[in-house]
Regions:
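Structured beta-strand/loop patches that form or line metal/cofactor-binding pockets in enzymes
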Residues: 1-32, 36-37
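Metal- or metallocofactor-binding catalytic centers and their adjacent structured scaffolds
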Residues: 26-99
Length: 99
């Protein structure tokens, strides 16, 4: 199984825009994660796009490896934007594993 795409979806709500992430695989299994970060939706979506470039074509079941590779590759480690994006993608990968 390989990751084929990662898409973001923004749901506009009062005072907070919710950001959801959906990871797609070549076997038709998808996973969903949530990455809301108040007033930083565009930065968050940009961070998810960078993660998409890394994960496309990779095995979605190697969750911990991908988490550490992405975290260590980031210049600003531990920041709110990166950690929210990474958390959402990680949730989606665990969702895929569970399915």
């Amino acid at each position: 199984m390989k990751v084929t795409d990662i898409k973001t979806f923004t749901v506009d709500c009062f005072r907070t825009n919710w950001v959801f992430v959906k990871v797609y695989t070549d076997e038709g299994i998808t996973g969903v994660g949530e990455a809301t970060l108040e007033y930083k939706e565009k930065a968050l979506i940009g961070a998810v796009e960078h993660i998409r470039e890394y994960l496309t074509g990779k095995n979605p079941l190697q969750i911990e490896k991908h988490f550490h590779d992405i975290y260590r590759d980031a210049y600003w480690r531990g920041g709110a934007v990166l950690m929210s994006a990474l958390s959402a993608v990680e949730m989606a990968l665990w969702d895929i594993l569970g399915k």
